[in-house]
Amino acid sequence: AYAEVVEPVRIPLNNKEYIHHEDPFTTNPELPIGFNAYTGSGDVTAEVVYANYGRREDFQKLEAMGISVKGKIVLARYGGNFRGYKAKYAQAYGAAGLIIFTDPGDSGYAKGLV
């Protein structure tokens, strides 16, 4: 049997950091939620399109494949370029929103000892 989606599924994103008892700053309720300075705010409901690192060449590749981000939410990994460029390119290609996430394979312990 296959799942049939007949209406959009709304998923609120929790931007609060998880509490780590080893880090006292994560227990401070006064700390703000994460944000990307100088970007717009709003409530967006749209299809999500994965755009790798959100670099210009990633958007060009999507375009060459016939995939448009116009009116959609772009999902991009941190790294590869400055996060401000991810927003700039997403806006230039007509995206309605942008979510930037950390890929565990690109950071932290997966990279090995420093």
PLM segments and residue spans:
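Noncatalytic luminal/extracellular "stalk/propeptide" segments of secretory-pathway proteins
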Residues: 1-70
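A conserved hydrophobic secondary-structure block that centers on an alpha-helix together
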Residues: 51-114
